[in-house]
């Protein structure tokens, strides 16, 4: 128990130093329409190359950042990087006579619940020059259902900025299905377990009907 606590505190301190020393980076995963082979957009993913630990997986550091209250500065940094890069890509696309593609950025429950998050997003969009309608903020079903009414208000305010909203892992909490229409979601990513259960005629199939 003591060793686990010590390791967690050490990782938390390392995350703080990593933010100060620019050890994090953003990589972009293509989102492609397979039937047409067309690039629809990219998803911004955070990576951490620690000077002594080496590559630290998001599964290892993101939960610690969440618990330590570090996900807000980390998430802000990722959003800033993604919007700056997105603005550069959009300018290049326009110069080539092509349509800009979207950039998707994941946001956490703590970011959504932060009273200053909407203003933060607005400020980043304005400073970066990235068109709001090409930004997609992605959150999970569990994030919106943690505090549904607060999430609904925050998402409505974010939508008013002109960006799009995506819901990931939908179907992991079936009770939320009837509440989906309350949220201004543009893109729905359905969890594979939900699809499998629908095909098998389980409880989700009845909910879909």
Predicted segments, located by residue:
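Active-site core of bacterial EAL-family cyclic-dinucleotide phosphodiesterase domains
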Residues: 2-64, 92-93, 101-109, 138, ...
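The catalytic core of metal-dependent phosphodiesterases that act on cyclic dinucleotides
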Residues: 41, 122-198, 202
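Helix C-cap/alpha-to-beta connector motif
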Residues: 73, 77-107, 123-134, 161
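Structural preference for long, well-ordered alpha-helical segments in enzyme cores
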Residues: 11-14, 18, 44-45, 64-65, ...
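Residues at alpha-helix caps and immediate loop-helix transition turns in enzyme cores, especially N-
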Residues: 7, 57, 116-118, 150-151, ...
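Signal-transducing alpha-helical linker
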Residues: 3-10, 14, 20, 66, ...
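Conserved long alpha-helical elements within nucleotide-processing catalytic cores of c-di-GMP signaling
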Residues: 59-63, 72, 156, 178, ...
């Amino acid at each position: 128990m003591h060793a686990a606590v010590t390791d967690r505190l050490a990782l938390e301190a390392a995350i703080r130093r990593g933010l100060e020393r620019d050890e994090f980076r953003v990589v972009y995963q293509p989102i492609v329409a397979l039937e047409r082979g067309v690039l629809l957009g990219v998803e911004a993913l955070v990576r951490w190359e620690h000077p002594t630990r080496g590559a630290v997986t998001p599964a290892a550091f993101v939960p610690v950042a969440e618990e330590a209250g570090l996900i807000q500065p980390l998430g802000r940094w990722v959003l800033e990087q993604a919007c700056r890069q997105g603005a550069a890509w959009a300018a290049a696309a326009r110069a080539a006579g092509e349509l800009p593609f979207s950039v998707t950025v994941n946001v956490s429950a703590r970011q959504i619940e932060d009273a200053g998050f909407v203003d933060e997003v607005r400020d980043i969009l304005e400073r970066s020059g990235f068109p709001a309608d090409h930004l997609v903020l992605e959150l999970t079903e569990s994030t919106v259902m943690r505090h549904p009414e607060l999430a609904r208000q925050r998402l409505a305010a974010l939508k008013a900025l002109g960006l799009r909203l995506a819901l990931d892992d939908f179907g992991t909490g079936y009770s939320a299905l009837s509440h989906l229409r309350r949220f201004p979601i543009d893109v729905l990513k359905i969890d594979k377990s939900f699809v499998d259960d629908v095909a098998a005629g389980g409880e989700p199939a009845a909910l879909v009907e």
